């Protein structure tokens, strides 16, 4: 089986650069599994985990929106924000989740921007999921 050159980049810089046998990502149209030789595509990403099947097992990256470009043997992910599993501070993520839940509750009561509160909650849950997947 061949391999893919994978790059995950945010406005703050690169988060992951390496080789993977498969990339699994959730797009707005559903989950995609990318193998070497995949047809070229560009797809918007949902707030979710990008799973990288690598020689040593699997790496998880919490990606908060963005786009995935597949071209030949390359997968480039341009994410709004992204964190590798080992870089996530679980205490900070849990506190962010709690703040987002409180903000969502307040938003529903006060009819303020519920969408932003829901996005903050999704991002916090995504980070926690990436950190605790094992």
Swiss-Prot record:
Source organism, top-level taxon: Bacteria
Membrane disposition: Peripheral membrane protein
InterPro entries assigned: ATP_F1_dsu/esu_C_sf (IPR036794), ATP_synth_F1_dsu/esu (IPR001469), ATP_synth_F1_dsu/esu_N (IPR020546), ATP_synth_F1_esu_C (IPR020547), ATPsynth_dsu/esu_N (IPR036771)
GO-annotated cellular components: plasma membrane; proton-transporting ATP synthase complex
Residues forming coiled coils: none
Localisation: Cell membrane
Record NCBIfam families: ATP_synt_epsi (TIGR01216), PRK00571.1-3 (NF001846), PRK13442.1 (NF009977)
Protein family according to the UniProt entry: Belongs to the ATPase epsilon chain family.
Name of this protein: ATP synthase epsilon chain
Species this protein is from: Listeria monocytogenes serotype 4a (strain HCC23)
């Amino acid at each position: 089986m061949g391999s893919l050159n994978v790059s995950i980049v945010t406005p703050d810089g690169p988060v992951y650069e390496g080789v993977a046998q498969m990339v699994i990502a959730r797009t707005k149209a559903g989950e995609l599994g990318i193998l070497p030789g995949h047809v070229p595509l560009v797809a918007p990403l949902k707030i979710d985990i990008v799973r990288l099947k690598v020689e040593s097992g699997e790496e998880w990256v919490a990606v908060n929106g963005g786009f995935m470009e597949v071209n030949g043997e390359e997968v480039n992910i341009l994410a709004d924000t992204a964190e590798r599993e080992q870089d996530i501070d679980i205490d900070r993520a849990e506190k962010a989740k709690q703040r987002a839940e409180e903000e969502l509750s307040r938003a529903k009561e006060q009819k303020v921007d519920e969408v932003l509160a829901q996005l903050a909650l999704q991002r916090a849950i995504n980070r926690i999921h990436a950190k605790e997947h094992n």
